[in-house]
Amino acid sequence: MNINRSVPLSKALVGTWELLTREDFTPTGERHIDSSLGADPFGLLFYDSNGNFAAQFMKRARNTSTTEIATQAAPNNSRAQGGYDAYFGTYTTDDTEGTVTQRLVGALSRENVGQVLTRAMTIAGNELVIRVHTAASSGAPIVRTLLWRRVG
């Protein structure tokens, strides 16, 4: 849902966003740390007015001296490799539902190409909140909440 009702989500979303926080919680409210990107990853997210987007995430304490095992893609999510995840493609918005559907045209992980991801989004001022229902690497359900700040 777009908090600023005078501007539809499809318009308010356009811009460059920097990740502030990324938190995963189990249905019982327990915090879960994603080992592939860590508790506090870097991230940039871009949406243009023509329906194109790009997303990049990197583990803040990325260790270049060892090989990190790639994680499995979870439902409604992509797959990180070596502490990094990136994908791009096209998007559509549902201003009434407050959701964005992303179609992955390219991705770091081949198996993510063609994937369709739907995200619940809320924009208030220069902050974007994305909520994703997905699963931990163990398969247990989690809700991921990402807080972004507009930087462009």
Where are these regions (language model features)?
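Lipid interaction determinants
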Residues: M1-G152
